[in-house]
């Protein structure tokens, strides 16, 4: 069952060692996928891990590339994305206005960790040509305010 909002006492700025740690505490349940949630209820969390070249992160707005279309061996975008699967969960979040937890892979003390950035909401989405020349879904997220 997805939880929309903060988990336990975790707050923005908290750091997590790896994807397993995120999953175990319920911050982001999938251990590999970048989107947690369902088509019916929406996305409860996303991870920006540097896997998609079209992602953009700023404090006041995140442009999150949809999932799909990447070659699993090279990580490169090789086909157009489609409004299916986890992308439908993000679209549903835009429709419901529910908050999405955002986690971001960051450099920390010579290594990498996942930082909880806080709650965001999906304000819009559209298809656009990505850096590799294929159609990519772009989801815009802004900090969530009640």
PLM feature spans:
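Compact mixed alphabeta submodule
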Residues: 109-146
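Acidic, glycine-rich low-complexity segments with interspersed aromatic residues
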Residues: 1-115
């Amino acid at each position: 069952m997805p939880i929309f909002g903060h988990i336990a006492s975790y707050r923005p700025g908290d750091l997590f060692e790896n994807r397993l740690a995120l999953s175990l505490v319920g911050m982001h349940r999938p251990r590999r996928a970048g989107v947690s949630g369902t088509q019916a209820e929406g996305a409860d969390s996303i991870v920006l891990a540097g896997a998609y070249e079209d992602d953009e992160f700023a404090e006041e707005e995140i442009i999150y590339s949809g999932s799909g279309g990447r070659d699993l061996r090279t990580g490169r975008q090789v086909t157009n994305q489609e409004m299916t699967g986890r992308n439908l969960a993000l679209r549903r979040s835009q429709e419901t206005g529910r908050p999405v937890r955002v986690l971001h892979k960051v450099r920390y003390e010579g290594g990498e960790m996942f930082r909880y950035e806080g709650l965001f909401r999906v304000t819009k989405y559209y298809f656009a040509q990505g850096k590799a020349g294929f159609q990519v879904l772009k989801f815009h997220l802004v900090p969530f305010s009640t």
